[in-house]
């Protein structure tokens, strides 16, 4: 992990410089306060109230919140860079630092937009389920001829869904998280290296105090933007299932304290402590194993449960067909199956709408990132002057 205790040593000097610069420059302090608020909002979006502690969001909802956060921070950084634009265009190293940041934002955008593939899969899966339910209603009324063939059309529709694998698989979102996080980690390293080069230049050249101040502000804004993206990305990965929920504290405490974000750290720590108390109570009640399983459930629908329901339905209908003997039919089992089919329809439609909403929001945030990155890079090349 990039922000491990060992690796944090590489960033310690830059973090101290950032904290010092915040004290020297009110505008940078204002930037920092705004960034802290955005991060606090993100933490709260991943958690319930203080009574229940830290509870992971569904992967698709977490993906939306993380993309929104990246877009907002990107916009915030862009505003500051544009405000000090004339200094950026004068120095090749500072210009390279800005280019590195926004080119990485564009790469992250490309990864984020892959969510559209999952949206399309979810829509196709929804169509198969809706078709299966409609076919079930038709088959149920079909009382002619061989009853052993009665629900074969329904089975055929369910098998189409099964053949897709699992279009609602939350692991697909986690895969995208990992790719985005890896790009953020790479960016942080490149920003650190370029910033160190810039710091050396500042020591060895004569320049006006006002220009030196602007160099310092810009380089610190870019560094902390990249640093926070990695810290937040670590939290998102944990909250979406890569590690236990309480592990977030260990992952984020060090970097949050290092940048002086005591308030943000306190918010996170309170959530973690509430969660730990909750788990301790569950241990005493001998229900901790069940609770840990629930920690990965979505608010209303487990993304993986839909495929499980389809498999169970297919087995149930197959069993019904096998149980038919001449003119005898298991009516009770049929009623039960109908209820499950109706429940499944509601589940899959609701989840598909959620995923479609994520796709719409990600597209909106991606457009924000693309536009701000383009605007800044255009300024750097001189075409936007």
UniProtKB/Swiss-Prot annotation:
Its main location: membrane. It is found in: Membrane. Keywords: Coiled coil, Membrane, Transmembrane, Transmembrane helix. It is a multi-pass membrane protein. The keyword Transmembrane helix applies. The chain crosses the membrane at residues 217-237, 242-262. InterPro entries: DUF677. Gene3D superfamilies: 1.20.1170.10. It holds the Pfam family DUF677. Residues 138-214, 267-294 form a coiled coil. Widely expressed. GO terms for cellular component: membrane. Belongs to the UPF0496 family. This is UPF0496 protein At3g28290.
